[in-house]
From Swiss-Prot:
Keywords: Chaperone, Cytoplasm, Protein transport, Translocation, Transport. It is found in: Cytoplasm. Belongs to the SecB family. Its main location: cytoplasm. One of its GO terms (biological process) is protein tetramerization. This is Protein-export protein SecB. Homotetramer, a dimer of dimers. One homotetramer interacts with 1 SecA dimer. One of its GO terms (cellular component) is cytoplasm. It comes from the Bacteria. It comes from Xanthomonas oryzae pv. oryzae (strain KACC10331 / KXO85). It holds the Pfam family SecB.
Length: 171
């Protein structure tokens, strides 16, 4: 039946016939960790906490039309030179991309997918920190479009410098 609906979306054959499509297939926690190696003494530390945030994104092609995107965040809090806590979250999603050119796929994977995953990361990091006995920390919005544009610039500069450093052919 060509009008059949699966989980609120058009059947796969219909989606391919309808043209380009971007779908969220699944969102899940891939890895999560919270450590507070100096608890409970750290709760009485009067030093100003220092926070360091590391953000990373990995993309893996699962098949012709599906990609796994993993948004990884590590938040480290130190106070008085001692680690108060380390919260690590890897939030992942499987995204369907059908009928799109490689450049459009690259843009979606680098901007829209992390934008979709980020609210899940923010909530999980905040919940972990509070469950560890610390005041909540709310990750501020991240401009993934700007990060993507910067990574494209870096890739372009690297490929240009590689082309410049290649030896000229023998004449």
């Amino acid at each position: 039946m060509s009008d059949e609906i699966l989980n609120g979306a058009a059947a796969p054959a219909d989606a391919a016939a309808a043209g380009p499509a971007f779908t969220i297939e699944k969102i899940y926690v891939k890895d999560v960790s919270f450590e507070s190696p100096n608890a409970p003494a750290v709760f009485n530390d009067a030093n100003q906490p220092e926070l360091q945030l590391n953000l990373n994104q990995k993309v893996q092609r699962l098949n012709d039309n599906a990609f796994e995107v993993v948004l990884a965040v590590t938040l480290t809090c130190t106070a008085g030179g001692k680690t108060a806590y380390v919260a690590e979250v890897q939030q992942a999603g499987v995204f369907g991309l059908v009928g799109l050119d490689p450049q459009a796929i690259d843009v979606l994977l680098g901007t829209q997918c992390p934008n979709i995953l980020f609210p899940y990361v923010r909530t999980l990091v905040s919940d972990l920190i509070q469950a560890g006995g610390f005041p909540p920390f709310y990750l501020q919005p991240i401009n993934f479009e700007a990060l993507y544009a910067e990574s494209v610039r870096q890739r372009h500069n690297e490929s240009a410098s590689l082309a410049d450093s290649e030896p000229a052919g023998n004449a």
